[in-house]
A protein has these predicted regions:
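Residues forming the ATP-binding cleft of Hanks-type serine/threonine protein kinase domains
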Residues: 335
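Formylglycine-dependent sulfatase
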Residues: 1-330, 338-359, 363-366, 372-373, ...
Length: 406
C-alpha cells in the first residue's frame, strides 16, 4: 500500500491498493507519467510489488508509466543476498553480480551515466534492510552481521523481546552497506558534474519492530514500524539542516513534482515540502494520518505529542479495506513515553485527549470516504503486553510511566 501511495500521491483506501496483491490503479495518472510528460527520461530499478503477474517479470502496462525497467515484482522471492535476478523491458531475466544492494547501486550508476545528457527521473527501490522472507533472516554482507552484533538495542525492542536479539545485527549490517552504496551514488553524481542539478531523496516504505508488537515485523501503528527516515540532497535542499514538522509519504509525490517545476494535480492528497524548506506558504498541519492493513484494518493520527489508533474488531464487516466500525486500540504520550511502552487508551483521565484526537481522525476519515462509528476500547487489549515498571527502570528510564502509580 505505501508503494501505491508514493506512485499516485493518494492514500491507499482511495487509490485502491489497500493491501498487498492489489495492482496499481490505472485510473490515476502515476508519478512517472507526470515526469515523462514534462520531458524527463524515466527509469525504475528494484522491487515493484504493484502488479499481479507473480514474483518476477512485470508486464509493460503494469509498470506505472516508467520507460526504462530493471525490476522484479517481489524482489525478495527472485533474489537473495548474493544472487540478484531482475527483469528488463523485454521481461528477460538479468542477473547482477555482487551483494544485492551493491548490484543495484551499480545498475543505478550505469543508468545515470548513460542518461547524463538528458533530464531523468530514476526511482530505485532497494529491498535492504527488509528481511529475507523464506528464511526469516536479515542477510547482511559477509562480515557485517558480526560487526554489529551485540550493539545498541532500542529500549522498546529490548523490553518487548520479539526476534530482536537474533536479527538486529544483520539488520544493522544491511543498513550500513546500503548507506555506503548511497554514498557511491552521490559520488557518481559529483564525478559526472550532476550533483548541483540533481535532487536525491531517500526514504523507506516502512520500519521494523521485529515481531515485538504482533506476530509480524512491520504492520502496526508503532513508531518502530510507522516512522521512517526521509532525507533530501541537492537543489533547494543543499543547505543542510533538520526539520521537525510532521510529514508523510503522501507528501513526497507533490514535493518531487514541485521541485521539478511540474504542476501538482489536485488529485494528490499531500503537500509539497518545498514551502517548509523555503519557509513560505500556509501553516503546516499539526498531525499526520495513517492507515494499517493486513495484520489489522486500522486508522490513526499522530501529533507531535500524541499517537491515537483505532482498528476494526475481528467480527466487523470490512469491505474494500474499510470498516463500518472501529474500536479505540492505542493511545500514547510520545513526550513522556517515546518508546510506546504504556498504552493509555483505556484510562478515563485521558478521555479528553482521546476525544480531541478522535475528532481529527474523523475529519481525515471523511476525506478518504469513510464515515464509521468509533467505539470505546474493548475490555481486554491485545497485541502488546503491559511492561512492568521494573523493566522500564532497568532500561535506564527514571520518569514515571504515565497513567500508572508506583
Amino acid at each position: 500500500p505505501a508503494r501505491a501511495c508514493i506512485q499516485t500521491g493518494q492514500y491507499a483506501t482511495v487509490n485502491g491498493s489497500y493491501r498487498n496483491g492489489i495492482p496499481l490503479t490505472k485510473s490515476v495518472k502515476p508519478l512517472a507519467e507526470h515526469f515523462k510528460d514534462a520531458g524527463y527520461r524515466t527509469g525504475y530499478i528494484g522491487k515493484w510489488h504493484l502488479a499481479q503477474t507473480g514474483h518476477g517479470a512485470v508486464n509493460e502496462e503494469d509498470r506505472g508509466g516508467y520507460r526504462d525497467w530493471l525490476a522484479a515484482n517481489v524482489l525478495e522471492f527472485t533474489s537473495h543476498d548474493y544472487h540478484t535476478a531482475l527483469y528488463n523491458e523485454d521481461n528477460a531475466e538479468v542477473e547482477l553480480p555482487g551483494y544485492r544492494s551493491d548490484a543495484m547501486v551499480d545498475a543505478g550508476i550505469r543508468y545515470i551515466n548513460e542518461h547524463k545528457e538528458e533530464p531523468f527521473f530514476l526511482f530505485m527501490s532497494f529491498i535492504e534492510p527488509h528481511h529475507q522472507n523464506h528464511v526469516d533472516d536479515y542477510p547482511a554482507p559477509d562480515g557485517y552481521r558480526e560487526r554489529y552484533a551485540n550493539r545498541w538495542v532500542p529500549p522498546d525492542l529490548a523490553a518487548l523481546g520479539g526476534s530482536t536479539q537474533r536479527h538486529l545485527g544483520g539488520y544493522y549490517g544491511m543498513v550500513k552497506r546500503l548507506d555506503e552504496g548511497l554514498g557511491r551514488i552521490t559520488d557518481a553524481l559529483k564525478s559526472l558534474q550532476l550533483d548541483e542539478n540533481t535532487i536525491v531523496v531517500f526514504f523507506s516504505d516502512h520500519g521494523c519492530h521485529f515481531k515485538t508488537r504482533n506476530a509480524e515485523y512491520k504492520r502496526s501503528c508503532h513508531e518502530s514500524s510507522l516512522r521512517v527516515p526521509c532525507m533530501f540532497h541537492g537543489g533547494p535542499f543543499a543547505g543542510g539542516g533538520r526539520r521537525d514538522e510532521l510529514v508523510s509519504l503522501i507528501d513526497l509525490p507533490p514535493t518531487l513534482l514541485d521541485v521539478a517545476g511540474i504542476d501538482v494535480p489536485d488529485s494528490m492528497h499531500g503537500q509539497s515540502l518545498l514551502s517548509r524548506v523555503e519557509r513560505t506558504g500556509a501553516d503546516w498541519p499539526d498531525h499526520v494520518y495513517f492507515e494499517t492493513s493486513e495484520a489489522e484494518t486500522g486508522r490513526g493520527v499522530r501529533t507531535e505529542r500524541w499517537k491515537y489508533h483505532v482498528r476494526a474488531p475481528e467480527d466487523a464487516a470490512v469491505v474494500d479495506g474499510k470498516s463500518d466500525v472501529y474500536e479505540e486500540s492505542f493511545l500514547y504520550d510520545l513526550q513522556a513515553d517515546p518508546y510506546e511502552l504504556a498504552n493509555l487508551v483505556g484510562i478515563e483521565s485521558y478521555g479528553g485527549i482521546r476525544s480531541g484526537l478522535r475528532e481529527k481522525l474523523m475529519e481525515r476519515l471523511a476525506f478518504v470516504g469513510e464515515t464509521p462509528e468509533i467505539a470505546p476500547p474493548p475490555g481486554t487489549r491485545g497485541g502488546q503486553r503491559m511492561v512492568a515498571d521494573s523493566e522500564v527502570a532497568s532500561l535506564g528510564f527514571s520518569h514515571n510511566i504515565p497513567g500508572r502509580s508506583r
